Amino acid sequence: MITLSAEQCRIIGVMLEKETTTPEQYPLSLNGITTGCNQKSNRDPVMSLSESDVQNLVDELVQMNQLMVDQKASTRVNKYFHRFCDTEFGNLKFTPQQRAVICVLFLRGPQTPGELRTRTNRLADFADVSEVDNTLTQLQDLNGLTLVRKLEREPGKRESRYVHLLSDVDESSFTQAVTTQTEVVLSEEQTSLTQRVTELEQQVASLTEQINCITELLNDD
């Protein structure tokens, strides 16, 4: 199974997305790939790759047989199509639903089944979240390949997220990020509670002092 960098995943995700949503613009030029990579909507994280960065990444993917130059293009500008999946001699054969899930995981990072159902709406049809669950189960053992994995559920969340396993990104970083967020929340809550206790202690001390003063006045009378 191939291992891709986060930037290479972004490029292939863009190719998969545009092939389905704007087939009239596919194969893509270098400019089209760059624009798709740096798109602010439907991307996480948002990237700022230069055209030269993208050219280097495209060249790497061509060497890996994941992209090819379209020799049939009638323009002077090179256009590229992917060979990542669903090719005659490739190992990865996806259903439209499996392909849509992988595409969104490439473009947006870890997702819950509910998020995947919403965010694949232009790529494939899912009747309900259970169909997404079934697709994720299939991708966990697709012809002997484990392409996605379920992450630990985040505190306060109803669903666990899933991450694809075709990247060299460390999965533990997602768990660490969740742990850090939880620690920050707990720290903020603890600080707020401490401040509240201090305020109450000050109020009690003030009331006690007032009561003592009143008691002294009554005793003097």
Swiss-Prot record:
It comes from the Bacteria. Pfam families: DUF480 (PF04337). Belongs to the UPF0502 family. This is UPF0502 protein CPS_0106. It comes from Colwellia psychrerythraea (strain 34H / ATCC BAA-681). Transmembrane segments: none annotated. The lineage of its organism: Bacteria, Pseudomonadati, Pseudomonadota, Gammaproteobacteria, Alteromonadales.
